[in-house]
């Protein structure tokens, strides 16, 4: 019996023997395709080839493409674990022809691979096929050339309500390449319910689609007209998990070797014994998508791809919780995943440490709110009477406890309860509206500025040039002219001003001509034109007028130093921390630079010092900052780093600094690294799970920062009557002295409190014959309060003591109950009741319990509540 890894390799070997180029699986993050959330089909990486926008050195290709369907149009998340064939992650085996072979060869290749004893050797009588209703060519190839009996060839027409809307007609979109397809089905046998495709019972599990062969032969125009393509192509896809299930003689994908191993390992880690539990299926599926997404550069976050990843991780963690997992478990599956994926696991293995760390951190973060969120959900579900959970509750779980909607839906599904999603959407929209109102943005010119043509950028070599005004925008509208005092956006035919991009701020400066001055405060790009944003301070401007465009050269220069320093920092981080470090965002201004990057753990002070030292070494090396224009493939072959999420054209600008840094970048840079002068890190911290941020200054700004630090040190030393060299020692002495005095003071407070014990006994009130002391004592630590309570219990013999103390703006609560009363009065119950009044919680033994709180203004109320409760319960 073939393993899944062997099947994957045999597919690639077969098509390689037929003259196909074996192409590596592309990233799960689609390159240069903003229309896709994740790679979800084998043809994604060849989309531009099919559209005629890209050419490859081969006309036949084959791949084993990793895919994710867990967001957007193709969203299988809610069904994963509950059906035999739904997954968030799967592998699509495919062969492709770019204007080479067509229907005859495509069908013959598929049949040979499936049925030949040399390859898969499936019984021919087990295979059924479908064709598009009018595709006589494909029908005849199957029937007359291949020899499939007519009764096992099914014509499928337009079964989705409109022309060419059919299971057997594929289209890339509303317009563009499209064509009929033929699908191959495997018959599992009459012991399983279900009918052949096109029958009323087609949704059963007896007949399973294993291969789809698409014939791209038309170009659909906007009016619906179908034009024949001059060079028809072929796009095929076969699910690796599905064909593995067929060859391994199982009916569910979750029973194939890969999943059996992952399920067994999950059960071992969490201590589960029932290997058929659906939660084990969910976790085994989710570790594949999560590990590969992280390996491909996705970081858990609250938006976009990162939020889909977070949703999948949290769903897996919740199912681990259902299985009884007591500690972080999800990341422990990564080594097993790498092992079972064989050759296809190499990308995860290369980044294994980072993948495991991010999964562990995300699980630990969610574990803090999971229990509280589930308690709230359980309580809400227990009160549901009409089978519908309110959208308000679902939104609170999302907003407060980090529960994605589909996780809440998962819990509800287990109890046959649905969610009022319309109410959830209303709450979400209301939150967006509040956020927009709070932001108080002015005019959004992104939706207003529409100008034909483009602005020619001259700023790489110039800071001043003559330019013609092609458009003016004022108060959100296109205008012909502007007057003094008006804030506007000026569009120029050409400009030396750099428009904000790649993290670098837009240039400032001014536009001028005879008697006219327009102060440019910022420059932004709107489509292909540059908008110069600012205020007219003298004269008037009109469309068609020529102006001098003059950039603030000093600000530009300082910005360029920071941008070049950012590249050096990126390279230094990767050298010292590891190649898992990739840029996640940046802000480059004239004042400072800010750099966000993937890093799962905190950076030590020693590492930070090493990073700073390395950057300064490369500055002193005085490398030339070299610029080259080349095609994207040549740039990558040269080792240039492409930034995650950036879209690049055919030609790219490559920035090289010696043998240390090479990146794709369109920004403004120093001429040599030595121009930067000095690099100084001023802050480093975490900004999100798995993402760190460094802020730094360079050049004169770095010198000014160091001068200010020196001034602070000198002033501090003067205050302590020390010098800078012995300042640390002086502060340590002062701290030691302060601690000693504080300890002596606390001792005096405790002594005074103990001496007051007899006064407390005298002031005890009787409630139904039981002595009760409920008092506020300020400035006393919890430890001292416990000593006092124990002493008073001995003095009273029988009674209840409840003390509240305010210390450093925090509330300390201690409750003691003598042993003869614990059957009726529990110290933990009473202290929790008091803690609720001061914004805290606590617990302990029936005879002694403690709590803390953050609302000292409510201490009197806590004492009163304790007295009232004791009056009621004694």
From Swiss-Prot:
Q: How is the cofactor bound?
A: Binds 1 zinc ion per subunit.
Q: Which InterPro entries match?
A: aa-tRNA-synth_II/BPL/LPL, Ala-tRNA-lgiase_IIc, Ala-tRNA-ligase_IIc_anticod-bd, Ala-tRNA-synth_IIc_core, Ala-tRNA-synth_IIc_N, Ala-tRNA_ligase, Ala_tRNA_ligase_euk/bac, DHHA1_dom
Its domain of life reads Bacteria
Where, per UniProt, does this protein localize? Cytoplasm
One GO cellular component, as annotated: cytosol
Q: Where does Zn(2+) bind?
A: 563, 567, 665, 669
The molecular function terms in GO held by this entry are: alanine-tRNA ligase activity; aminoacyl-tRNA deacylase activity; ATP binding; tRNA binding; zinc ion binding
Q: Which cofactor does it need?
A: Zn(2+)
- Class of the enzyme per the UniProt entry, highest EC level: ligase
Q: Which UniProt keywords apply?
A: Aminoacyl-tRNA synthetase, ATP-binding, Cytoplasm, Ligase, Metal-binding, Nucleotide-binding, Protein biosynthesis, RNA-binding, tRNA-binding, Zinc
Coarse class of the primary localization is cytoplasm
Catalyses: tRNA(Ala) + L-alanine + ATP = L-alanyl-tRNA(Ala) + AMP + diphosphate
One BP annotation, GO: negative regulation of DNA-templated transcription
UniProt-listed Enzyme Commission number(s): 6.1.1.7
| Role summary | Catalyzes the attachment of alanine to tRNA(Ala) in a two-step reaction: alanine is first activated by ATP to form Ala-AMP and then transferred to the acceptor end of tRNA(Ala). Also edits incorrectly charged Ser-tRNA(Ala) and Gly-tRNA(Ala) via its editing domain.
Reproduce the free-text note on domains from the UniProt record.
Consists of three domains; the N-terminal catalytic domain, the editing domain and the C-terminal C-Ala domain. The editing domain removes incorrectly charged amino acids, while the C-Ala domain, along with tRNA(Ala), serves as a bridge to cooperatively bring together the editing and aminoacylation centers thus stimulating deacylation of misacylated tRNAs.
Similarity remark: Belongs to the class-II aminoacyl-tRNA synthetase family.
- Protein name, as recorded: Alanine--tRNA ligase
- The protein's organism comes out as Haemophilus influenzae (strain 86-028NP)
């Amino acid at each position: 019996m073939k393993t899944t890894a062997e099947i994957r390799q045999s597919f690639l070997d077969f098509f390689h023997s037929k003259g196909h180029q074996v192409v590596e699986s592309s990233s799960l993050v689609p390159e240069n395709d903003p229309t896709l959330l994740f790679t979800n089909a084998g043809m994604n990486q060849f989309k531009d080839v099919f559209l005629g926008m890209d050419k490859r050195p081969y006309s036949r290709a084959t791949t084993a493409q990793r895919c994710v369907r867990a967001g957007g149009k193709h969203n299988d998340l809610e069904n994963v674990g509950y059906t035999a064939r739904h997954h968030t992650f799967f592998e699509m085996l495919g062969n492709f022809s770019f204007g080479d072979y067509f229907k005859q060869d495509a069908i013959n290749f598929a049949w040979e691979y499936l049925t030949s004893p040399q390859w898969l050797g499936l019984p021919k009588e087990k295979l059924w096929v479908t064709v598009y209703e009018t595709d006589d060519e494909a029908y005849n190839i199957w029937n007359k050339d291949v020899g499939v009996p007519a009764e096992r060839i099914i014509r499928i027409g337009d079964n989705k309500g409109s022309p060419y809307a059919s299971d057997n007609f594929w289209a890339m979109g509303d317009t563009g390449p499209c064509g009929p397809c033929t699908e191959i089905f495997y018959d599992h046998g009459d012991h399983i319910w279900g009918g052949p495709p096109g029958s009323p019972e087609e949704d059963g599990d007896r007949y399973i689609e294993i291969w789809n062969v698409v014939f791209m032969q038309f170009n659909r125009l906007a009016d619906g007209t179908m034009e024949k393509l001059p060079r028809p192509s072929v796009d095929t896809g076969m699910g690796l998990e599905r064909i593995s299930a067929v060859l391994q003689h199982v009916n569910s994908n979750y029973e194939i070797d890969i999943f059996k191993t992952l399920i067994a390992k999950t059960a071992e880690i969490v201590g589960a014994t029932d290997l058929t539990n659906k939660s084990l299926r969910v976790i085994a599926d989710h570790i594949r998508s999560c590990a590969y997404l992280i390996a491909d550069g996705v970081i858990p976050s609250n938006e976009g791809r990162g939020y889909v990843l977070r949703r999948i991780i949290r769903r897996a963690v919740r199912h681990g919780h259902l299985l009884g997992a007591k500690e972080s478990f999800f990341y422990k599956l990564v080594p097993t995943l790498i092992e079972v994926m064989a050759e296809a696991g190499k990308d995860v293995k290369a980044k294994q440490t980072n993948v495991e760390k991010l999964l562990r951190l995300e699980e630990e973060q969610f574990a803090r709110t999971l229990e509280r969120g589930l308690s709230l959900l359980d309580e809400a579900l227990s009160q549901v009477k009409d089978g519908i959970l309110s959208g308000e509750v679902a939104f609170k779980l999302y907003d407060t406890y980090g529960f994605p909607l589909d996780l809440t839906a998962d819990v509800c599904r287990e109890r046959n309860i649905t969610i009022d999603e319309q109410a959830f959407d209303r709450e979400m929209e209301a939150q967006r509206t509040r956020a927009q109102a709070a932001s108080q943005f002015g005019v959004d010119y992104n939706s207003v500025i529409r100008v034909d043509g483009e602005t020619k950028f001259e700023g790489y070599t110039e800071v001043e040039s003559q330019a013609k005004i092609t458009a003016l925008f004022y108060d959100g509208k296109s205008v012909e002219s502007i007057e003094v005092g008006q804030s506007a956006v000026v569009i120029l035919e050409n400009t030396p001003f750099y428009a904000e991009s790649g993290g670098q701020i837009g240039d400032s400066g001014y536009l001028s001509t005879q008697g006219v001055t327009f102060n440019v405060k910022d420059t932004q790009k709107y489509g292909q034109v540059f908008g110069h944003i600012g205020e007219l301070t003298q004269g008037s401007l009109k469309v068609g007028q020529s102006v001098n465009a003059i950039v603030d050269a000093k600000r530009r220069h300082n910005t360029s130093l920071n941008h070049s320093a950012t590249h050096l920092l990126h390279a230094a981080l990767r050298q010292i921390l590891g190649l898992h470090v990739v840029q996640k965002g940046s802000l480059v201004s004239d004042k400072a630079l800010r750099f966000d990057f993937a890093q799962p753990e905190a950076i030590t002070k020693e590492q930070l010092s090493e990073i700073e030292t390395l950057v300064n070494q490369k500055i002193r090396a005085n490398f030339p900052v070299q610029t080259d224009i080349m095609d994207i493939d040549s740039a990558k072959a040269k080792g240039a780093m492409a930034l995650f999420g950036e879209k690049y054209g055919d030609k790219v600008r490559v920035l090289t600094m010696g043998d240390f840094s090479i990146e794709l970048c369109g920004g403004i840079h120093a001429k040599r690294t030595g121009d930067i002068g000095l690099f100084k890190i001023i802050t480093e911290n975490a900004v999100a799970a798995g993402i760190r941020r460094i802020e730094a200054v360079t050049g004169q700004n770095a010198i000014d920062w160091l001068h200010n630090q020196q001034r602070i040190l000198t002033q501090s030393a003067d205050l302590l009557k020390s010098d800078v060299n012995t300042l640390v020692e002086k502060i340590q002495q002062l701290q030691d002295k302060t601690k000693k005095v504080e300890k002596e003071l606390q001792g005096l407070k405790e002594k005074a409190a103990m001496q007051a014990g007899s006064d407390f006994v005298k002031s005890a009130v009787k409630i139904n014959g039981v002595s009760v002391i409920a008092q506020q004592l300020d400035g006393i630590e919890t430890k001292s309060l416990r000593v006092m309570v124990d002493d008073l219990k001995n003095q009273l013999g029988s009674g209840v003591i409840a003390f509240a103390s305010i210390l450093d703006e925090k509330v300390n609560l201690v409750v003691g109950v003598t042993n003869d009363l614990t059957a009726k009065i529990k110290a933990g119950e009473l202290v929790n009741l008091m803690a609720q009044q001061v914004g805290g919680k606590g617990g302990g033994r029936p005879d002694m319990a403690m709590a803390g709180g953050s609302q000292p203004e409510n201490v009197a109320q806590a004492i009163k509540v304790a007295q009232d409760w004791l009056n009621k319960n004694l």
